[in-house]
């Protein structure tokens, strides 16, 4: 993940878990050890689309979903893949083999949320902790 993406992730996570929407650029810069200009840069696009509202001394995550959707549209998942394999089985069968510690992502996740896939898909992505990767390899 790029630095600006870690800022977006943090803003979304804090909003979701702690219901905190008001932040300062200096506070985030200190938290991550980034420069204030890096944090400021991370807020440019979300501000343009109305996800973030900047005030003189702070900013507010105004629209959680806009930031989430924007991040999803620009995120490069391929960089975060730490294990890749091929299985000739059907998609539903592969999804059934994912260990209980795994969290579905992308199309697999959407097909569970909406009870139907948003489109045909041929890859299964999921998140899993590093210590559980061996379970996924089996």
Features from the language model and the residues they span:
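Short coil turns linking two alpha-helices in DNA-binding domains
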Residues: 24, 34-42
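A broadly conserved amphipathic alpha-helix scaffold signal in soluble, globular proteins
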Residues: 9-12, 26, 44
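A short, conserved structural fragment
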Residues: 47-57
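Short, cationic-aromatic polyanion-contact patches
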Residues: 1-5, 24, 57-77
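Short amphipathic alpha-helical interface segments
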Residues: 5-18
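Short acidic, hydrophobic short linear motifs in intrinsically disordered regions
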Residues: 17-30
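Short gly/ser-rich loop at a beta-strand->alpha-helix junction or flexible surface loop bordering the NTP-binding
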Residues: 78-138
């Amino acid at each position: 993940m790029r630095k600006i993406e870690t800022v977006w992730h943090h803003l979304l996570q804090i909003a979701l878990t702690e219901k905190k929407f008001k932040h300062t650029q200096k506070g985030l810069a200190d938290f991550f050890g980034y420069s204030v200009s890096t944090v400021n840069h991370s807020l440019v696009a979300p501000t343009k689309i109305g996800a973030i509202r900047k005030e003189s001394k702070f900013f507010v995550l105004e629209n959680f979903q806009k930031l989430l959707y924007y991040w999803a549209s620009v995120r490069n998942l391929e960089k975060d893949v730490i294990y890749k394999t091929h299985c000739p089985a059907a998609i539903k069968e592969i999804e059934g083999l994912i260990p209980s510690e795994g969290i579905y992502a992308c199309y697999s996740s959407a097909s569970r949320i909406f009870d139907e896939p948003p489109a045909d898909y041929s890859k299964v992505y999921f998140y899993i902790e590093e210590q559980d990767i061996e379970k996924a390899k089996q």
